[in-house]
Design a protein with these regions (language model features):
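Acidic/histidine-enriched ion/cofactor-binding microenvironments in catalytic or ligand-binding pockets
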Residues: 150, 155-156
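Short, acidic Gly/Pro/Ser/Thr-rich loop/turn segments
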Residues: 47-48, 155, 170-171
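Conserved phosphate/anionic-ligand binding catalytic regions in large, soluble enzymes, centered on
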Residues: 156-166
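C-terminal accessory segment of soluble enzyme catalytic cores
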Residues: 130, 169-222
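Active-site donor-binding loop signature of nucleotide-sugar glycosyltransferases
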Residues: 11, 150, 190
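N-terminal lobe of the biotin/lipoate ligase/transferase fold
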Residues: 1-145, 194-198, 222
């Protein structure tokens, strides 16, 4: 097993509090004073703006608090019913390749979705993980179920991924998610496959080694 910590927060964590904790931990990792960390949590309802966010994509600026953040990407929604995964890995000890890291995140999400019989796919022109809506007999309709937004600071990763378990999907209407128009957002619940956070978290953790373990492309250097 890799030398890495896992933390699951049972209570919702305020956004700025989480960012502060993450930045402090990343600083300690950079100095070799702390182990890598994968942190699973939920936030209260909010919109976060990545470094490429366009103000026109914020359709309802007064609906929820809006936070500017250093991660890549555009606007996204976070809130109850969504599993947030903040990933703090030291790529100096792994593979210093940002594209390979993002690819590993995508594959990790897709692998986890498959454990619940949901077929997630990536798209070269659209960030995130997508599903074809065969559940409503609309195979040509694609909705996003997982989002990715990262930052790399001195080769230590920040931010990470979010997967829609059972959020209020109407809350996404206040933004154009990730600046991508013409596509919807879905969740496990929306697709008729409600699950418990515990079950999702266990499958996510079980799949970590496959994509970030010692024998993976993003594994620790020997």
């Amino acid at each position: 097993m890799d030398d890495i910590d896992w933390l699951i927060s049972s209570e919702r964590v305020e956004y700025l509090e989480a960012i502060g904790i993450m930045n402090e931990r990343v600083g300690s990792i950079q100095k070799g004073e702390a182990r890598e960390l994968v942190w699973l949590l939920e936030h209260p309802p909010l919109y976060s703006a990545g470094t490429s966010a366009k103000l026109d994509d914020l359709l309802m600026p007064n609906r929820f608090p809006v936070f500017n953040t250093g991660r890549g990407g555009q606007y996204t929604y976070h809130g109850p019913g969504q599993r947030i995964v903040y990933i703090m890995l030291d790529l100096r000890r792994r593979r210093q390749d940002i594209r390979a890291y993002v690819s590993a995140l995508e594959n990790w999400i897709i692998n986890t979705l498959a454990k619940f019989n949901i077929h997630g796919e990536r798209r070269s022109d659209r960030i995130g993980i997508w599903v074809r809506r065969t559940d409503i007999q609309q195979p040509n309709k694609e909705d996003k179920i997982g989002a990715i937004g990262i930052r790399i600071k001195r080769w230590v990763t920040l931010h990470g991924i979010s997967i829609n378990i059972a959020p209020n999907l109407e809350h996404f209407n206040g933004i154009i998610p990730c600046g991508i128009e013409g596509y919807g957002v879905t969740s496990f619940e929306d697709m008729g496959q409600p699950i418990e956070f515990y079950d999702f978290d266990m499958e996510l953790r079980n799949g970590f080694q496959k994509f970030f373990g010692a024998r993976s492309e993003m594994g620790l250097k020997g």
